[in-house]
Amino acid sequence: MATRYDAVVIGAGPAGEGAAMKLVKEGRRVAVIDQLGEVGGNCAHVGTIPSKALRQTVYNLMRFRRDPLLSRMADIRSVPLSQVLARAHKVIETQVSTHHRFFERNDVDLYFGQARFEEPNLISVLTPEGITERIGFEHAVIATGSRPYQPADIDFN
Protein backbone atom coordinates (compact mmCIF):
# COMPACT_ATOMS: atom_id res chain seq x y z
CA MET A 1 0.00 0.00 0.00
CA ALA A 2 1.37 3.40 -0.98
CA THR A 3 1.41 6.43 1.29
CA ARG A 4 -0.53 9.23 -0.45
CA TYR A 5 0.53 12.86 -0.85
CA ASP A 6 -0.80 15.83 -2.73
CA ALA A 7 2.71 16.45 -4.04
CA VAL A 8 6.10 14.80 -4.01
CA VAL A 9 9.35 16.71 -4.52
CA ILE A 10 12.44 14.85 -5.70
CA GLY A 11 15.49 16.68 -4.39
CA ALA A 12 16.06 18.28 -0.97
CA GLY A 13 18.39 21.05 -2.12
CA PRO A 14 17.48 24.74 -2.30
CA ALA A 15 15.04 24.37 -5.22
CA GLY A 16 13.35 21.28 -3.77
CA GLU A 17 13.04 22.88 -0.37
CA GLY A 18 11.57 26.03 -1.89
CA ALA A 19 9.02 24.04 -3.89
CA ALA A 20 8.06 21.96 -0.86
CA MET A 21 7.59 25.02 1.35
CA LYS A 22 5.45 26.77 -1.27
CA LEU A 23 3.24 23.69 -1.62
CA VAL A 24 2.88 23.32 2.16
CA LYS A 25 1.90 26.99 2.48
CA GLU A 26 -0.84 26.28 -0.08
CA GLY A 27 -2.19 23.57 2.24
CA ARG A 28 -0.80 20.56 0.38
CA ARG A 29 0.49 17.37 2.00
CA VAL A 30 4.07 17.05 0.75
CA ALA A 31 6.83 14.44 0.72
CA VAL A 32 10.43 15.15 -0.26
CA ILE A 33 12.79 12.45 -1.55
CA ASP A 34 16.56 12.81 -1.72
CA GLN A 35 19.21 10.26 -2.59
CA LEU A 36 22.00 11.93 -0.56
CA GLY A 37 20.56 10.74 2.73
CA GLU A 38 20.39 14.27 4.09
CA VAL A 39 18.75 17.58 3.25
CA GLY A 40 20.57 20.51 1.66
CA GLY A 41 21.61 18.99 -1.65
CA ASN A 42 25.00 19.51 -3.22
CA CYS A 43 24.81 23.19 -2.25
CA ALA A 44 25.12 22.33 1.44
CA HIS A 45 27.39 19.31 1.21
CA VAL A 46 29.92 19.81 -1.59
CA GLY A 47 29.25 23.15 -3.25
CA THR A 48 28.42 26.65 -2.09
CA ILE A 49 28.33 26.22 1.69
CA PRO A 50 31.61 24.30 2.16
CA SER A 51 33.55 26.54 -0.23
CA LYS A 52 32.22 29.73 1.36
CA ALA A 53 32.91 28.40 4.87
CA LEU A 54 36.52 27.60 3.93
CA ARG A 55 36.96 30.95 2.23
CA GLN A 56 35.57 32.85 5.23
CA THR A 57 37.80 30.97 7.69
CA VAL A 58 40.93 31.72 5.64
CA TYR A 59 39.84 35.35 5.21
CA ASN A 60 39.37 35.71 8.99
CA LEU A 61 42.79 34.18 9.69
CA MET A 62 44.46 36.56 7.23
CA ARG A 63 42.63 39.54 8.72
CA PHE A 64 43.64 38.50 12.22
CA ARG A 65 47.29 38.21 11.20
CA ARG A 66 47.29 41.67 9.58
CA ASP A 67 45.71 43.46 12.55
CA PRO A 68 48.54 44.76 14.80
CA LEU A 69 46.48 44.52 17.98
CA LEU A 70 44.98 41.10 17.33
CA SER A 71 48.18 39.54 16.02
CA ARG A 72 49.89 40.29 19.37
CA MET A 73 47.19 38.43 21.27
CA ALA A 74 47.88 35.02 19.75
CA ASP A 75 50.26 33.35 17.34
CA ILE A 76 48.26 31.98 14.43
CA ARG A 77 51.06 31.49 11.94
CA SER A 78 50.30 27.83 11.73
CA VAL A 79 46.71 26.72 12.04
CA PRO A 80 46.30 23.01 11.33
CA LEU A 81 44.27 22.23 8.23
CA SER A 82 42.22 19.84 10.37
CA GLN A 83 40.94 22.83 12.39
CA VAL A 84 40.05 24.76 9.24
CA LEU A 85 38.17 21.74 7.86
CA ALA A 86 36.46 21.13 11.22
CA ARG A 87 35.12 24.68 11.07
CA ALA A 88 33.72 24.07 7.57
CA HIS A 89 32.07 20.83 8.73
CA LYS A 90 30.48 22.67 11.67
CA VAL A 91 28.99 25.23 9.27
CA ILE A 92 27.60 22.41 7.10
CA GLU A 93 26.10 20.67 10.15
CA THR A 94 24.43 23.91 11.22
CA GLN A 95 22.98 24.47 7.74
CA VAL A 96 21.66 20.90 7.49
CA SER A 97 20.15 21.09 10.97
CA THR A 98 18.42 24.38 10.15
CA HIS A 99 16.94 23.03 6.93
CA HIS A 100 15.88 19.81 8.64
CA ARG A 101 13.91 21.91 11.15
CA PHE A 102 12.20 23.75 8.25
CA PHE A 103 10.88 20.45 6.93
CA GLU A 104 9.85 19.20 10.40
CA ARG A 105 8.15 22.44 11.40
CA ASN A 106 6.11 22.39 8.19
CA ASP A 107 5.15 18.69 8.45
CA VAL A 108 6.99 17.67 5.29
CA ASP A 109 7.79 13.95 5.25
CA LEU A 110 11.36 13.12 4.21
CA TYR A 111 12.38 9.97 2.37
CA PHE A 112 15.99 9.12 1.63
CA GLY A 113 16.91 6.86 -1.25
CA GLN A 114 16.62 6.54 -5.01
CA ALA A 115 13.29 7.63 -6.47
CA ARG A 116 11.80 5.90 -9.48
CA PHE A 117 8.54 6.63 -11.25
CA GLU A 118 6.62 3.33 -11.38
CA GLU A 119 3.32 4.67 -12.73
CA PRO A 120 2.02 8.15 -13.59
CA ASN A 121 1.10 8.81 -9.93
CA LEU A 122 3.33 6.35 -8.09
CA ILE A 123 6.98 6.56 -7.08
CA SER A 124 9.06 3.89 -5.42
CA VAL A 125 11.94 4.85 -3.15
CA LEU A 126 14.75 2.34 -2.67
CA THR A 127 16.29 3.18 0.71
CA PRO A 128 19.97 2.63 1.56
CA GLU A 129 18.79 -0.32 3.70
CA GLY A 130 17.31 -1.98 0.61
CA ILE A 131 13.68 -1.32 1.57
CA THR A 132 11.30 -0.15 -1.15
CA GLU A 133 8.71 2.41 -0.10
CA ARG A 134 5.83 3.35 -2.39
CA ILE A 135 4.50 6.89 -2.57
CA GLY A 136 1.32 7.91 -4.34
CA PHE A 137 0.96 11.53 -5.40
CA GLU A 138 -1.13 13.97 -7.39
CA HIS A 139 1.71 16.27 -8.52
CA ALA A 140 5.49 15.83 -8.76
CA VAL A 141 8.33 18.34 -8.78
CA ILE A 142 11.73 17.21 -10.02
CA ALA A 143 14.40 19.39 -8.41
CA THR A 144 17.49 17.23 -8.74
CA GLY A 145 19.95 19.96 -9.65
CA SER A 146 21.86 20.67 -12.81
CA ARG A 147 25.31 20.68 -14.32
CA PRO A 148 26.87 23.51 -16.31
CA TYR A 149 27.02 23.09 -20.06
CA GLN A 150 30.59 23.27 -21.32
CA PRO A 151 30.85 23.98 -25.05
CA ALA A 152 33.71 22.09 -26.69
CA ASP A 153 35.36 25.30 -27.93
CA ILE A 154 35.50 27.07 -24.53
CA ASP A 155 38.22 26.27 -22.00
CA PHE A 156 36.86 26.42 -18.43
CA ASN A 157 40.32 26.50 -16.84
Description of each model-found segment:
Residues 17:
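Residues forming the Rossmann-fold NAD(P)(H) cofactor-binding site
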